[in-house]
């Protein structure tokens, strides 16, 4: 073989071995205009006030705290400083855009030194791509390292997923997760209390290979609502072990830990601007219930939340007969706002109801702080490729010398 051809082949082998693989993403095609509640797994790139983090995602600061089971009745929550490296779940509406499920409500004001690539990878943690940003803003033919003028407002579409709000026939909220260095399918499954098999099935993965930058979705067991379609919070779903704030911050809804029944009560910050939360023809307030033992079982009368319409909180009074009277309602544990990045959001139990754990109402001290879960140590990846690349480069060096 002529030396020039050999040299070209060796150079090609070296480039293939050391070039980073293109990240894989799970995309959900869609045709419906209806958005669904979704979650994004996001790690803070810098120390940020909660208000600054919320502005990045056009989200309600209290909704972010609630989605992470962080006490949202603390004083001045928006001014709380969250540390860099803190992993959080960010609740977002997942819409249908150009036939793909994406978050379309995010706006970002560029700062000096920003590029399309830095906004996508650093600011938004790989939840979007430079191409998506350039396409959404009509910046045709722009390269990823193209500078963005400071002060420019960018539309930033983000990955998300709905998949009908179910997983294996059970209610679910989907969390979009960007794999980090050393992540494995098994480790991600363990962290979110699911199985590697389910993750592979949901993400249509033929093998359990996961590389840094890959985007997958994780189904989380959830409590769903059945509000009428004309309500502002139609389709509300809350991941197990967490909370949601709705009805203009007047109502808080929780899911778990003992079952997957949505439970809503007046929010800790509800004030005189909130509409009445009393059930009609009753003295019962939202979240109240009464028990009456009968010869046929336990008659449970409850005042439940029915959605939010034009500033009015809808309530429903229902009576149901159950074999046994339920005990006091248990709430998912709440934790204080974190001051360290060594933090894991509370993970609720599996879809199968478990014995209730001690919980607290928002605004009260938590009874316990959940233990952080950790996956296996980072697995070495692309070792063979690295060795081949080094070998090929050495051969090229010898030929050039």
Curated annotation (Swiss-Prot):
Segments forming a coiled coil: none
Lipidation (GPI-anchor amidated serine): 373
Cellular component annotations (GO), alphabetically ordered: plasma membrane; side of membrane
Signal sequence coordinates: 1-23
PROSITE patterns (alphabetical): LYSM
Highest taxon in the source lineage: Eukaryota
Sugar-bearing residue positions: 240, 281, 288, 310
UniProt GO BP: innate immune response
Record-linked Pfam families: LysM
Disulfide bonding pattern of the chain: 30-96, 36-162, 94-160, 96-162, 223-255, 250-279
Assembly notes: Interacts with LYP6. Interacts with CEBIP. Interacts with CERK1.
Listed name of the protein: LysM domain-containing GPI-anchored protein LYP4
Organism of origin: Oryza sativa subsp. japonica
Gene that specifies this protein: LYP4
């Amino acid at each position: 073989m002529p030396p020039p051809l050999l040299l070209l082949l060796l150079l090609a082998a070296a480039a293939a071995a050391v070039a980073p693989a293109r990240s894989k993403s799970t995309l959900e095609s869609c045709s419906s205009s209806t958005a669904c509640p979704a979650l994004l797994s996001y790690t803070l790139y810098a120390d940020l006030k909660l208000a600054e983090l919320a502005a990045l995602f056009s989200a309600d600061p209290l909704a972010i705290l609630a989605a992470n089971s962080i006490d949202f009745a603390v004083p001045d929550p928006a001014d709380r400083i969250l540390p860099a490296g803190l992993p959080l779940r960010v609740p977002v509406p997942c819409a249908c855009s150009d036939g793909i499920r994406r978050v379309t409500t995010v706006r970002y004001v560029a700062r000096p030194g920003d590029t399309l690539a830095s906004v996508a990878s650093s600011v938004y943690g790989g939840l979007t791509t430079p191409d998506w940003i350039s396409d959404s803003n009509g910046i045709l033919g722009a390269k990823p390292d193209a500078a963005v003028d400071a002060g420019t407002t960018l539309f930033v579409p983000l990955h998300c997923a709905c998949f009908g709000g179910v997983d294996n026939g059970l209610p679910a909220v989907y969390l979009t997760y960007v794999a980090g260095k050393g992540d494995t399918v098994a480790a991600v499954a363990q962290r979110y209390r699911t199985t590697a098999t389910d993750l592979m099935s949901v993400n249509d993965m033929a093998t359990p290979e996961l590389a840094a930058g890959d985007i997958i979705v994780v189904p989380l067991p959830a409590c769903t609502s059945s509000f009428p379609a004309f309500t502002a919070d139609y389709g509300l779903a809350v991941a197990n072990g967490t909370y949601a704030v709705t009805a203009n911050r007047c109502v808080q809804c929780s899911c778990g830990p003992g079952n997957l029944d949505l439970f809503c009560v007046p929010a800790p910050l509800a004030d005189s601007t909130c509409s009445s939360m009393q059930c009609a023809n009753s003295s019962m307030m939202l979240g109240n219930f009464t028990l009456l033992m009968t010869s046929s079982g336990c008659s449970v009368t409850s005042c439940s939340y029915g959605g939010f319409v034009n500033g009015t909180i809808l309530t429903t009074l229902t009576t149901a007969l159950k074999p046994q009277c339920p005990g006091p309602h248990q709430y998912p544990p709440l934790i204080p706002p974190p001051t360290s990045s060594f933090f894991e959001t509370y993970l609720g139990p599996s879809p199968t109801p478990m014995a209730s754990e001690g919980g607290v109402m928002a605004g009260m001290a938590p009874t316990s702080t959940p233990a952080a879960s950790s996956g296996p140590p980072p697995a070495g990846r692309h070792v063979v490729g690295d060795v081949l690349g080094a070998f090929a480069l050495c051969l090229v060096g010898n030929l050039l010398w």
